[in-house]
């Protein structure tokens, strides 16, 4: 892949101190593994709102640092401490943390007082949780944003769409992710990611209760990520409108990641006498079960097609960063 050079723009001041509206922000990526490399490729050659000025990691021999260096991007194997002493850091406006749960606290601790913004792709919950298709506008001024998990990025917009038409008494999210698309760090944090997804489905999606299941799919050749979202609602009298809203949010997420799509039409099943379900912590339920089947493919970028779990988070992070830049430009313009 070919990425253009990302040299620092002339005349840029310290982080957070630019006097005028900024059309193109220099950013840094912490973490040179698969996630960081994919994010770098999605940002591209700097002809949009973002340009990668630095990438740092801890493995000097990893592919991500080699690709960044070949693209003219400054690199360091010194991690966040290496970033802080790079000449380019003086102009960095925003940092993406793509490392792992073990490093996320220390990375933000080192950067919190520098004035840079951070988008955390490790699902750390240090900052507010962000699903750009649902709650981006409310988070644009936060110094640290935690990108929701891959399952939450896929499912929360669906639950929120159903919630517009009534109370979602229970939502269940079942994601099957290719074994080849999960690294060692992700495998040991599956339970934590499930908890974070459940919280996002409730707090951002609006479900009263929720549950998340993650299945590691060993199929070879590997399959794309597939997420099934179940919503239990008392009534679903507006079937056509619910389906239309679900289709609209799918289109919205597709704008961020073209590989996000409905696998089948939205399904509605009436549950009644002799055909009820049990909601944990609530009891017997008779109403309507809405089922949405999604497939997430890593369209474009650095990843194989099966790694939709990574692509949906890097795509969401890129879109969030671009919105932050636009929001900052509009805010500065309004103050002039």
From Swiss-Prot:
Catalysed transformations (reactions): acetaldehyde + NAD(+) + CoA = acetyl-CoA + NADH + H(+)
Pfam families on file: AcetDehyd-dimer (PF09290)
GO molecular-function terms, A-Z: acetaldehyde dehydrogenase (acetylating) activity; NAD binding
Origin superkingdom: Bacteria
SMART domains per the UniProt record, alphabetical: Semialdhyde_dh
Keyword Transport set for record: no
Active site location: 150 (acyl-thioester intermediate)
Keyword presence, Zinc: no
Binding annotation for NAD(+): 32-35, 309
EC id: 1.2.1.10
Alphabetical keyword list: Aromatic hydrocarbons catabolism, NAD, Oxidoreductase
Entries under SUPFAM superfamilies matching the protein: Glyceraldehyde-3-phosphate dehydrogenase-like, C-terminal domain, NAD(P)-binding Rossmann-fold domains
InterPro entries per record: Acetaldehyde_dehydrogenase (IPR003361), Acetylaldehyde_DH_C (IPR015426), NAD(P)-bd_dom_sf (IPR036291), Semialdehyde_DH_NAD-bd (IPR000534)
GO BP annotation list: catabolic process
NCBIfam families for this protein: ac_ald_DH_ac, PRK08300.1
Record family assignment: Belongs to the acetaldehyde dehydrogenase family.
UniProt protein name: Acetaldehyde dehydrogenase 1
């Amino acid at each position: 892949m070919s990425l253009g050079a990302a040299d620092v723009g002339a005349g840029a001041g310290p982080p957070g101190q630019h006097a005028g509206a900024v059309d193109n922000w220099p950013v840094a990526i912490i973490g040179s593994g698969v996630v960081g490399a994919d994010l770098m490729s999605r940002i591209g050659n700097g002809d949009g709102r973002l340009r990668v000025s630095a990438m740092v990691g801890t493995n000097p021999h990893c592919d991500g640092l080699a690709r960044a260096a070949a693209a003219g991007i400054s690199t360091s194997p010194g991690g966040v401490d290496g970033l802080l002493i790079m000449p380019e850091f003086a102009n960095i406006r925003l940092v993406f943390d793509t490392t792992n749960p073990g490093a996320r606290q220390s990375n933000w601790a080192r950067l919190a007082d520098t004035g840079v913004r951070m988008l955390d792709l490790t699902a750390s919950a240090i900052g507010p949780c962000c699903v750009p298709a649902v709650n981006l506008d409310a988070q644009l001024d936060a110094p640290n944003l935690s990108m929701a998990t891959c399952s939450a990025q896929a499912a929360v917009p669906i639950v929120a769409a159903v919630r517009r038409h009534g109370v979602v008494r229970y939502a269940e999210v079942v994601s099957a992710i290719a074994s080849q698309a999960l690294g060692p760090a992700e495998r040991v944090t599956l339970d934590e990611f499930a908890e974070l997804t459940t919280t996002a489905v409730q707090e951002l999606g609006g479900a009263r209760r929720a549950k998340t299941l993650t299945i590691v799919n060993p199929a070879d050749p590997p399959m794309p990520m597939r997420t099934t979202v179940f919503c239990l609602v008392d009534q679903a009298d507006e079937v056509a409108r619910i389906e239309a809203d679900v289709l609209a949010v799918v289109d919205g997420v597709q704008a961020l990641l073209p590989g996000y799509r409905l696998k089948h039409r939205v399904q509605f099943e009436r549950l009644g006498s002799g055909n009820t379900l049990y909601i944990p912590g609530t009891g017997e339920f008779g109403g309507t079960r809405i089922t949405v089947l999604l497939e997430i493919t890593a369209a474009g970028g650095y990843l194989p097609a099966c790694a939709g779990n990574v692509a949906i988070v890097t795509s969401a992070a890129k879109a969030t960063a671009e919105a932050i830049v636009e929001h900052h430009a509009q805010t500065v313009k309004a103050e002039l």
